[in-house]
């Protein structure tokens, strides 16, 4: 691998011109025991900060992009290879200065690398979304250790507490793996309790899948497929209730909504609290708006994963 990746990464093409994904690094240093990425893509390589700024500036000021989602295997490790320190806060400061009228979204962070400085910058910047994708994968210390995940139950709980204290209206997304080798009833019950107690706004859960060439492939105490499916189902059912409770709290609130498309009964969009493609949507009633416009919307109804709103004239 070259010591620095090419500064002119081809941009991942977004589904619509108003939203774009910008890759800030390649490769991964985390070496989770279930994952092949470090073997396939090599060591973590941060992109040059100037090339990222240039790309985002062009997306925003030339292409009219309204939302920039930063992506990498772990965006929070940005700069550690080139500057020997976490550079994401510095990158965010520079990106936030490009325009007041953009949403900057943080995807794929690592709980062990989210610093107080990062949380403070998010809290202070009006154009950084009140949203954080924070995949924890599990919460039981012995499972986290077997997964070779940095962090612990105490560290993750403390981090979420600090994030919510500084940014009370933040929407947190997480990803979980159920049925990892060694996950017994006790470990699973602990995970279930954590999901209920923490109340993530968005959550994805995946039954563990054996991957050839990973350390976990040969771990003892593999979990039966039926048990994995059952655990997956239990978490999803619980999350449905958690999500519905959270969505109902938005009724009566006025949110800025990015209009994304037209449907038979009106329009559909998202607020800063929903990421493109993976989270719920907001169905809009009112005068037709241009796609890519951000409009104030009063939330009038909620379902388990979506909201309904009326455009405020």
PLM feature spans:
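Conserved SAM/AdoMet-binding glycine-rich loop
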Residues: 60-186, 196
